[in-house]
Amino acid sequence: MADAAVGTGPSGAAGQATAAALVQLPPVVAAEYRAAVAALRQSYAALPPGAPVRLAKRTSNLFRFREPAPKAPDRRALPGPRGAAGLDASAFTRVLHVDPAARAAVVGGMTTYEDLTDATLQHGLMPLVVPQLKTITLGGAVTGLGIESTSLRSGLPPESVTAMEIRPGDGRVVTATAEGEHAELFRGFPNSYGTLGYALSLTIELEPVAPYVHLRHFAFTTPEACMEAVAEVAAEGSLRGHRADFIDGTAFGLDEIYLTVGAYSEVAPWRSDYNGQNIYYQSVRGPREDFLTIRDYLWRWDTDWFWCSRPFGVQNPLIRTLWPRRYRRSDVYRSLVAFDRRHRLSDALTAHRGLPPREAVIQDVEIPVDRGAAFLRFFAAEVGMSPVWLCPLRLRSDSPWPLYPLRPGEVYVNFGFWGTVPLPPGQTDGYHNRLVEAGVGALGGHKGLYSTSFYSEDEFWAAYNGPAYARLKSAYDPTGKLSGLYEKCVRGR
């Protein structure tokens, strides 16, 4: 991607994808970017042999807690904890260029979706899939997990990427596209979680937006009825005659499930605000219609981290009044959780009260829609946590992504659940998570690897295409400069 990102996009919207792939960077921006790439290559080459590598970055949405790599505002690399080197990625945290005519953007790999959408909404455009939390980065969503309410019609974030400039573990910088020399890396990069390399920049497609989103909430009293409605939207693009540009849902229990269908709207007779005292997830139980600005819709879940702000007291009306609005956001809550994990404050309080220890169950899993009801019933019986987020998805392209083998054409539902549950007497940490992993496998699903996993090595590689990963690792990181996928996602290295 010297001064331009070149290549062809995945199938679907082929003409637009081709236009996106040919976006030219302005000369000054291109020169600054090339200088940043050269500096990163130099610092990477200077790392001691055998030293593990981490990015020193501002944010993280992973829940495999470990000591962070140090932030490096003024230096290209710093020695990290346990011998890990923290490479400074600050030069890759900006939107390099938005091309409204091509409906495309060239974006640094460490750019947050908050910054990206701030840049694109000025032009009446947004990425095809905008994950729910502001500080998720574009590179993180492509190499890890990213999903949202457009995923039934637009798939996953990698599917609207037309080109990536990647720094693999072997130290090269390569341009990967769907049909170029590094096409296998292009398709194998999703779900590699930084173990094959890091995306320095990505060229992505954009779609036009309207100023508002018109929401309609539909209630269901059984999981089966809810899954039938998801299948209806997948087949018809609407639910009970209402267009579905967006669809997700919230399950408060087996007999109280809501699907929220959104449609772009040029007008809004009123606009709700869930950045103040009102809380979005509670609103789906109320009036059946709602209107949000497009920006507020994109970040409707971030203000309360879905419902996970509750343990911090932020949903208490008095505390909410005192809690500054600028601190009602997911990265603040995540920092509080990380602090608690480091100091074991919640564990100590639980023990002091004489209560059983609690296990963190923080997962996103994809289940075929025809088995979605079975999963909800299994989860209610074995884990018993609520609410649960529901997000339908279907791959946009006809080609699978080797390391996360969802089947093209099949409709899945992502179930997200994030919290803690008490351990049964005699059980140890990991009990519920292992139950979830076994249940997901039995139902033909997969789970995202952004949080703790307990798979055996054989189970892991059977689920995540070990042979394909081994080929890519051999080609792009033959000396193992970067951690392996199993080592990183299961062993926490």
Residue locations for each model-derived region?
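Noncatalytic alpha-helical scaffold of FAD-dependent oxidoreductases
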Residues: M1-R493
